[in-house]
Amino acid sequence: MDGTTIVALLYDFDRTLCTQDMQNYAFIPSLGMDPEDFWREANDFGRREHMDGILAYMYTMIRKCREKRVPLTRESLRRCGESIVFFPGVDGWFDRIDRFGTLLGVQVEHYVISSGLREIIDGSAIAGHFKEIYASEFYYDGAGWPVWPKLAVNFTAKTQFVYRINKGVLDVSDDRTLNASMPDDSKRVPFTNMIYLGDGLSDVPCMKMMRAYGGQAIAVYQDANRPGVEQLLRQGRVDYIYPADYSEGAGLELTVKEIIRRMAVNHRLSEEKHAQLRAVQGT
């Protein structure tokens, strides 16, 4: 490590950064379906076939497009991302947080860990702000048609990507380096320098992981899911809860900035402590 303080913000996507499931904005309407009907069909199929829910919805996307003769390509999904509606303040959030980090001498990095589709996220207005996007994704044949899940990110699988960010092993095909032993002081982003933002039960594995290893977990809410988020706080599964408002000066921004400030101080103190130990040990 070069001594640079890196703070990583890890985001769920649907209902955390945008107002609803990303498929609801453009993809499902292109099928002539209501979102409620699509998700009921996908979930019923998954339960009937005892299938992972993420694989079930990805299969249902392919099947419905074939049935209705709707083109389904990487580019058509990217175009769906252009219709995503974000919560207030999201458009300027990343630049503001980055500038704040720079003032503190902190390198802030943003990551997505989502059960939604990478192709749709890639087409969204904020895709360029993320160092890496971990989300479900299709593999396409030579004609450009999706034929297999390239990556399926369910709720518990999300934790794998927290470890990847911790070690700096971002390539999902590199399991050897990910699973190799690595000294804590060689890990690129300590867990104590991570903030996870999510919206509910699907984020609990990552939120619990943050709290277990010294990171911070924040749940954001809309009116509909506020009771569930308040329950997460009562149960000690998250550190803070806020309305899904990323505007300048809102409570969420103020708290995230204070957390980053504290992480920067703690990192510098830890570096000083280890430097003194090395000096007295003659190493």
State where each predicted segment sits.
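Short, basic/aromatic recognition patches
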Residues: 1-2, 191
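Alpha-helical substrate-recognition element adjacent to the catalytic core
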Residues: 2-142, 238
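C-terminal cap/substrate-recognition subdomain and adjoining C-terminal extension
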Residues: 88-111, 115-283
